[in-house]
Curated annotation (Swiss-Prot):
The keyword Transport applies. Electron carrier protein. The oxidized form of the cytochrome c heme group can accept an electron from the heme group of the cytochrome c1 subunit of cytochrome reductase. Cytochrome c then transfers this electron to the cytochrome oxidase complex, the final protein carrier in the mitochondrial electron-transport chain. Belongs to the cytochrome c family. The modification N6-succinyllysine is found at residues 56, 73. This is Cytochrome c. One of its GO terms (cellular component) is mitochondrial intermembrane space. GO terms for molecular function: electron transfer activity; heme binding; identical protein binding; lipid binding; metal ion binding. The gene is CYCS.
Amino acid sequence: MGDVEKGKKIFVQKCAQCHTVEKGGKHKTGPNLHGLFGRKTGQAPGFTYTDANKNKGITWKEETLMEYLENPKKYIPGTKMIFAGIKKKTEREDLIAYLKKATNE
């Protein structure tokens, strides 16, 4: 799929202000993403989600993240994530490759 190192740079530039990835990492404006893959929307323990996130009911995997990261507010109307999204498919693939590794270590 994507390039992990390029994905890490994208995460630092576009995501790290609001999210952490390491096990036991703290929630910021957005939830800690450790254990993201295979988890349902709105389920990170200790984070307060909107009903829209809790009720979406999808499981995070490569395909759902590809769609979500392109336009979060379109994929989950009512989400409090203010990020506009990543339009370039290759950048989303790189970010997902990084997240797959970093949220599972």
